[in-house]
Amino acid sequence: MTETSIIPVFFATDENYVPYLGVSLQSLIAHTAHNKQYEIYILHDSLSEHAQQQLREFKQKNVNISFLKVSDHLQQYQSRLKNNLAFWNQPTYYRLALPLLTANYDKILYCDCDTVFL
């Protein structure tokens, strides 16, 4: 498979948004091209094994699902983030780690957990 036929898709979530992410994944998978490979990466800090297993059930022949714990990558930002966590939840900041996690891709697609693909 060539690199152009791989589509990396990133989501960030915590335990509270797993049901919404499930809907998003279901709608994405319903609209995938069978000749493309979709690499789904779920950014999290402490997603339970149960939640991860629920999301793994969306795996298909052309859809792989991986979990990336981002807390290690965000440690350098912790002091700056602490003051802003009152305004946004922590998964909002997981996007800061994307440049560190996506170096082997020219392009990625980042989607919020409540995205519905039509």
Q: Residues of each region from the PLM?
A:
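Short, surface-exposed alpha-helical segments at coil->helix boundaries
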Residues: 22-25, 49-53
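N-proximal low-complexity "stem/linker" segments adjacent to membrane-targeting elements
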Residues: 1-26, 30
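GT-A fold catalytic core of metal-dependent nucleotide-sugar glycosyltransferases
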Residues: 91-118
